Amino acid sequence: MELKGTKTEQNLMTAFAGESQARNKYTYFASKARKEGFEQIAAIFEETAANEKEHAKLWFKELCGGESPDTAANLEAAAEGENFEWTDMYAEFAKTAKEEGFARLAYLFEAVGKIEKAHEERYRKLLENVKDGKVFIADDVVIWQCTNCGHIHVGKEAPKVCPVCAHPQAYFQRVANNY
């Protein structure tokens, strides 16, 4: 049976959005509870947020035909989403806020729009690396670090297996010294 265009598809999208928003709210609520000295309540909010994440994942998978798309497709979808946010959504929100006299909110919408543009660029570069087989291979010698144990390797390619902790190449990333 075809899901596309049905009321059930709309319900799945609503359920996914609702569970996603609940997860974020509960995470924020946990932070506030912790700041106010309520560790148990914070932990319960965090536990519930984790449950909501799993509910959202369930509905997302159903919307995707039962399985999440591969990383290349996810990077493309993420880039497209970020593009919409900075070119359309936040630009329109900023315009409306200005027209209605909310200068601070207009500024924030514009500022977040710039961040979303950077997100799009990052996703597009990562997608290019995936397509070109350059996630773990560089044209020049670079510094690679195992994100599990911290092992440093210098070379054009990340090790297939970390020589210290035996984690696979997937745990290596290029080091960006920003200090």
Q: Which residues does each predicted region cover?
A:
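Non-heme di-metal
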Residues: M1-Y179
